Design a protein with these regions (language model features):
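Generic serine detector
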Residues: 2-7, 18, 46, 84, ...
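Short loop/turn elements at secondary-structure junctions
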Residues: 87-152
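Short, glycine/alanine-rich amphipathic alpha-helical segment
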Residues: 79-88
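Conserved short "hinge" loops at termini or chain/domain junctions
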Residues: 1-80, 143-152
Length: 152
């Protein structure tokens, strides 16, 4: 008797969808690394991940536009030059988490087992959690508090 196990398909991006470079000031986003770090399986196609990550990069870059402008005026050509390695790490964290939030929302009603109603709420909560993580990463880059609260 022999046992045979089906191997899972590879979760690598197609080469033309493996990186996002919109602006040389900000770090390159490696989508193969994102897949591994955020546990994005092969049910998300290369094109879909690329599109969702592109939206996240645009969103994060807009939030950091003033930071970029100030850095360029100070003679710094990249986000990494503004400080230690921390801004690059936080930038990646923001992009990865916004991407995962977008994917969680889009695929909230997708479930191969047919239990979509019970999983919808938990996936929506996950999307909110990913967004909160991304917001915290951007707040760290900007040097502002992560939470704004006012006593009424």
């Amino acid at each position: 008797m022999s046992l045979s196990f089906a191997s899972a398909p590879k979760t690598e991006q197609q080469p033309e969808y493996s990186q996002i470079v919109l602006d040389t000031f900000f770090p390159v986003i490696n989508l193969n690394h994102m897949r591994q770090a955020m546990r994005i399986d092969n049910t998300i196609t290369s094109v879909r991940l690329y599109e969702m990550a592109l939206e996240a990069v645009i969103h994060v870059n807009r939030q950091l536009a003033l930071t970029k402008q100030r850095a360029l005026m100070a003679g710094q050509q990249t986000l990494v030059q503004t400080d230690s390695k921390l801004p690059e790490i936080r930038y990646r964290h923001a992009v990865y988490n916004y991407t995962k939030a977008n994917l969680s929302e889009i695929y909230a009603d997708y479930d191969a087992t047919g239990k979509t109603a019970s999983r919808f709420e938990s996936k929506q909560q996950s999307a909110d959690d990913y967004r909160r993580e991304a917001h915290a990463a951007i707040a760290d880059i900007l040097g502002v508090h992560r939470v704004d609260a006012e006593l009424i």
